[in-house]
């Protein structure tokens, strides 16, 4: 009888352990970007488990990585919209292992509150996730302001100003909407950092003479006729000067 009971318990345990179903998921992040990943369905939530990919226009790989128990593990690879490798980030050690040189012109620019002399050394802040995919969470938080004339959607430029603390944390976001060619703000509003996950608020801080400092990241975006925005596509002619 004891052997029979033990066998029943073992079978029930195996049934519960192997009853977790792995499901392939696909989500649309923006008009142009979709993500595909595997999840384990638990009682209260979906847990990402396994290979993760994101694609631009359904065919160009933007991201390749792996989740274990909803946590990014190992080295993730991030690409631009042309499929060029932009960044390798080691999530096991929270370390940047590769960052491609930034071309010029670039839709991203950076500021620190220091006058940089010839002998000074400054480095810009870096977003884990690369210079395209890493910034999509902020673009997804964009909302069209009430009263904005739809006739001007595709004539508008949207600029995000991200304030990054010396600790490498997102401190504030200011959104500027202007008409193309004017450089004059038509609307300005803030997006609270509280809207984002802890991972989406992490940066490698800017440095000035090897000391971490506060900085600003400016992201230039274009708006289409539907009111959707994307980081402006600029063809870089050469790496920016260091």
Q: What kind of region is each of these model predictions?
A:
Residues 1-26, 242:
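Bacterial Sec-dependent N-terminal signal peptides
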Residues 23-242:
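Charge-biased low-complexity segments
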């Amino acid at each position: 009888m004891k052997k029979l009971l033990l066998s029943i318990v073992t079978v029930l345990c195996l049934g519960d352990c192997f009853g977790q179903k792995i499901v392939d998921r696909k989500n649309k992040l923006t008009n142009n970007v979709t993500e595909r990943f595997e999840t384990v369905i638990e009682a209260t939530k979906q847990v990402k488990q396994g290979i993760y990919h994101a694609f631009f226009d359904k065919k160009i790989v933007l991201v390749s990585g792996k989740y274990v128990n909803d946590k990014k593990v190992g080295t993730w690879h991030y690409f631009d919209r042309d499929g060029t490798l932009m960044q390798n980030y080691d999530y096991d050690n929270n370390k940047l292992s590769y960052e491609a040189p930034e071309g010029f012109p670039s839709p991203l620019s950076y500021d620190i509150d220091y006058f940089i002399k010839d002998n000074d050394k400054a480095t810009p802040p870096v977003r884990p996730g690369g210079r395209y995919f890493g910034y999509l969470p902020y673009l997804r938080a964009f909302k069209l302001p009430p009263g904005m004339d739809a006739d001007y959607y595709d004539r508008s430029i949207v600029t995000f100003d991200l304030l990054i603390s010396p600790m490498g944390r997102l401190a504030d976001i200011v959104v500027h909407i202007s008409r193309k060619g004017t450089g004059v703000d038509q609307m300005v509003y803030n997006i609270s950092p509280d809207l984002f996950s802890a991972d989406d608020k992490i940066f490698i801080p800017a440095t000035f003479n090897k000391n971490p400092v506060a900085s600003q990241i400016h992201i230039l975006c274009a708006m289409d006729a539907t009111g959707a925005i994307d980081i402006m596509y600029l063809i870089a002619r050469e790496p920016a000067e260091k």
